[in-house]
Every structure is written in structure tokens, then in C-alpha cells.
């Protein structure tokens, strides 16, 4: 069964990118922070893809890929780093992110809870081509690990979409520089609809946003009814780790991601409704979200069951003048000119095919390449979500006025590994 645009707010049923340096006249995209200015703008040479075995038999693993454009082995797998036992199979590898100093890679297991396993995995990547698994951790009040926000002095904030039982409320877990969990925020979470998925921050404004997506357990067959999708943005006092405002977007069915606009003096952000196909401009100060673009108007238009093509994850370059997105059902990766945030204009599109299933996207630090993975989530015989994709990894070259697929980079996770087809999801590079 596919997810449907049905939403109810159930009560709880069961027991940072990185900090933006306050530099005068310069603001970097929240998902481009970390390291020195030179590191941020250097073209990466190593690509990491966090993936799982499609058969759910072999260990989850980190694929290390040659990402050096000058290399004759560009696009080839260098090695894999399997997660060691216990708890190393069928975690449903999801998102991952480097620490601010780029020496630690944190990865999430979306469905680790179903097997009683730890769901947050840490790798030492100080030697880029030879990562070393460190350990796995877990929340005490939360689960269903999603996105990571690296902290400037080390550590991470981590969106945990569900409670300890996969229900509501979720939390934002905090890990310190020693990678020890020190808190699960907020101390008094909202009881209704708090299931954080996306996360974005501008510490120089003392501002953080999270986006609520879905009550996780509602996607399982054992829970009657359709998946309970959310449509809301939480505005946080970043320093106090406290929610100060909720922006409800009733028609935005499934607010999977949110991105603050780098350098925007009003601290505005973009989000999109996965099932309504609309892009919203969020004003945290005013507590508003207005429709500024309809993905039904993307050219070429691909007719699919979900309105707007099923827009999922977002990315923004350091300039804050472009918004990139992946449309899972339409099989497209697009770019909008958002130099006027209230009037986005399409400036680029790459069509991968309706069966491709692009989901996760990640810009290189120099904003010149976009990595795309074709897989969202398939709960197989135990759940209602079946969005498989074709398991390919793509590189798209990003120009100011267009997007262009890199024909040299061809990587198919169906055939790349001796253990059999794998599901690629999380993306990072160094």
C-alpha cells in the first residue's frame, strides 16, 4: 500500500548541519558548513554512500567511492565498510552527515527500533579512503533516526522522528564532542504531531527549524489505517534548544524537509509538501508559510499519481539564490531561481525517468556538483510504504542557469557489490 494524503493528530501512545560562523557579509548554506573556508570550497575527492542490503541479510555498510574528477577510476567503489555485529543488519540506512571538522561521519538507521538495535552509527573518516567504524548509540526517549545537524564545536543534533516506541512525540537528540548523548530536546515536547524529520539552523540568528513529517509507527501494517502525515514547521530558540513557535501548514501533506535561506536578513526558509506538490516560503518571525511555487508547473511535466511529482528532499547553495529538489515519482531533479524568494522561477531540470526514484540529494562544498541517490524507503512485507527506486547514484553538474547530468559517473547499487542488490540512501563527501 502506498502512502496516502490522510492525516490525524494522535496523542502519544508509548512509554546540525553545522553551526554557521558569524562572519560579516558572508553566510553559508546550513548544509554546507564545517571545516575551514578552504575546506568548504574545495572540490571533494571521496564520496560516501550509506546503504543497506535489499534482502536484509547482509550487514549495512558504508560505500567509499572515488569522487576525484581527475582520477581514471572516478565513480568506482574503492571499498566498503560493513557495520560489525551486533545489530548490524536491516537498520534501514537513512541519512548521514560529517562533523564540523569533517573527521566523524554520523549515520542513521531509520528502522533499527524494529529489531531492538541501536540506530545511530559513528565512523572515523580522518583517513578519507579508509573509514573506521567506531560504535553505535541510541536515544532513551526517542527513535527513528533521520537527519543530522553538525555543531560547530563538535557533536551533532539529530532528528528522531518517533518516541522510544516509534510513536509521538519525537525528539532532537544532542551528542557532544565526545559523541555521547547529553540530551533529547525539547525537555517538554509537544504531545501532538511532533515528529521531526528535516532540520536547519542559523546560529548567528539563534534560529533553528525542524519539519514534522509522519508518525512513524503509522506506516507499519500492525497499526490500522493510513500513514499519519504531518504538515508543520517548529521554530526553535537555538541556544536554549526550545520550541518557541509552531507554524501549521494544513495543506502541506508531509513536510519532509526545511532549508533556511543563507544570508536572508528575515531568517526565512523553504519547505515543500510531499503530497500537495507546493513549495512554501516560511517566515519564522511572522509565523507564516505562503505558497510560492507549484511543482505541477515544472517543465517538462511528468504525469504521475502524486501531485507535483512527490517532492522530497531539498538543498541550497551557499549563495542562497537557488533551491534544488528531488521529485521521487516524477523521476526529476530540479532547480529554482529563488533570488526573489517570493517568486521562484525554474532554471534547471534533469529527468532520470519515472522509475528512477531520486530522493536524497547533496551539494558538494563548492556547489558545483549534486549527488543523487535513487531510493526512499521500502518496508517490504511489514509496512505500507513501498518507494524503491532503481538504486542508482547520479552526479549532476550545477550551473547558475541549468543542470547537467555527469555522463562519466555511473554507479548502480544493484550490481556493484558481491552481496547482491543494495539500497543507497545517505550521502556525504570529503
Please annotate each region the language model reported:
Residues 34-38, 84-100, 140-154, 190-205, ...:
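Beta-rich, blade/repeat-based domains predominating
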Residues 41-42, 49-56, 107-117, 159-169, ...:
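Short, conserved, GDST-rich strand-edge loop motifs in beta-rich repeat architectures
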Residues 63-67, 118-126, 169-179, 225-240, ...:
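Beta-propeller blade signature
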Residues 73-83, 132-138, 182-188, 244-248, ...:
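Beta-propeller fold detector
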Residues 74-150:
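Blade-loop segments of beta-propeller domains
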Residues 99, 191-195, 199-336:
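Beta-propeller domains
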Residues 118-204, 212-214, 218:
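Asp-box/WD-like beta-propeller blade repeats and closely related beta-sheet repeat scaffolds
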Residues 305-386, 393:
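Loop/turn-rich, solvent-exposed surfaces of beta-rich toroidal or solenoidal domains
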